[in-house]
Amino acid sequence: MEGGFTGGDEYQKHFLPRDYLNTYYSFQSGPSPEAEMLKFNLECLHKTFGPGGLQGDTLIDIGSGPTIYQVLAACESFKDITLSDFTDRNREELAKWLKKEPGAYDWTPALKFACELEGNSGRWQEKAEKLRATVKRVLKCDANLSNPLTPVVLPPADCVLTLLAMECACCSLDAYRAALRNLASLLKPGGHLVTTVTLQLSSYMVGEREFSCVALEKEEVEQAVLDAGFDIEQLLYSPQSYSASTAPNRGVCFLVARKKPGS
């Protein structure tokens, strides 16, 4: 993109949650690359957090944006979930849904699909209430800080989740590598990092605005995770991509890694 890296000030001023949600999470118009990407993530998360999968007391989601789909599986296996985002508007959008305020975004299609994966599509309303009860706080975050939740200090968590966020928050591969080390600092030794990264994406559209990303290769993501003190337990590549007019990525990788006990 011509304007260079999109920093925090631009996100705070110009990132409009409803434009983002309507572009990437609107399923009224039938099948789309965006809907398929959501299904890919929900399927991966179900396998990761479902029966026999990761569980624990505390999970921190870094860079939640205005979305809740990413913790629909985890709310069944963790007791205390923290959502976080850099911008005020995104945190306000999350609060609207959590508090069931008028005009909150309708996540019913995602809730129903998540429940289908669990074998009980009829309990989607129960799932929504379970998630609302499990999310204990919504905090400001900045993955580029040594403590991404500054000024709040939370006890080390069992799991850190970050989907489709780090590549947007970081201005370079070096910054991405540093951000992963920052995320590692939020975890207990032996805790897990769960992440989805869009590959080879240099920018994406939200409404009429273009936001920059660091274009990452699968091998760069893998090496950055290893160098941040993790052992990789699962690395799944998919050619799944968004619509070329909104987010022209080339594939995506889903990764589960365990923080080394001594790190």
UniProtKB/Swiss-Prot annotation:
Keyword Cytoplasm, does the record have it?
yes
**Catalytic reaction equation(s):** a tertiary amine + S-adenosyl-L-methionine = a methylated tertiary amine + S-adenosyl-L-homocysteine + H(+); a secondary amine + S-adenosyl-L-methionine = a methylated secondary amine + S-adenosyl-L-homocysteine + H(+); a primary amine + S-adenosyl-L-methionine = a methylated primary amine + S-adenosyl-L-homocysteine + H(+); dimethyl sulfide + S-adenosyl-L-methionine = trimethylsulfonium + S-adenosyl-L-homocysteine
Residues engaged in binding S-adenosyl-L-methionine = Y20, Y25, G63, S64, Y69, D85, N90, D142, A143, L163
Q: N6-succinyllysine modification sites?
A: K13, K96
Q: What class of enzyme is it?
A: transferase
Write the Enzyme Commission number(s) for this entry. Answer: 2.1.1.49, 2.1.1.96
Any one Gene Ontology MF annotation carried by this entry is: amine N-methyltransferase activity
Record-level GO BP terms: amine metabolic process; methylation; response to toxic substance
The entry's localization annotation reads:
Cytoplasm
Q: Name one GO cellular component term.
A: cytosol
CDD domains from the UniProt entry:
AdoMet_MTases (cd02440)
Q: State if Nuclease is listed as a keyword.
A: no
Keyword entries, A-Z: Cytoplasm, Detoxification, Methyltransferase, S-adenosyl-L-methionine, Transferase
Tissue specificity note: Highly expressed in lung, also detected in liver and at very low levels in brain.
What the entry lists under SUPFAM superfamilies is as follows:
S-adenosyl-L-methionine-dependent methyltransferases
Assembly with partners or alone = Monomer.
Q: Which family does it belong to?
A: Belongs to the class I-like SAM-binding methyltransferase superfamily. NNMT/PNMT/TEMT family.
Report the function annotation for this chain: Catalyzes the N-methylation of tryptamine and structurally related compounds. Functions as a thioether S-methyltransferase and is active with a variety of thioethers and the corresponding selenium and tellurium compounds, including 3-methylthiopropionaldehyde, dimethyl selenide, dimethyl telluride, 2-methylthioethylamine, 2-methylthioethanol, methyl-n-propyl sulfide and diethyl sulfide. Plays an important role in the detoxification of selenium compounds.
User: Under which name does UniProt file this protein?
Assistant: Indolethylamine N-methyltransferase
Could you tell me which species this protein originates from?
Oryctolagus cuniculus (Rabbit)
| Gene name as annotated | INMT
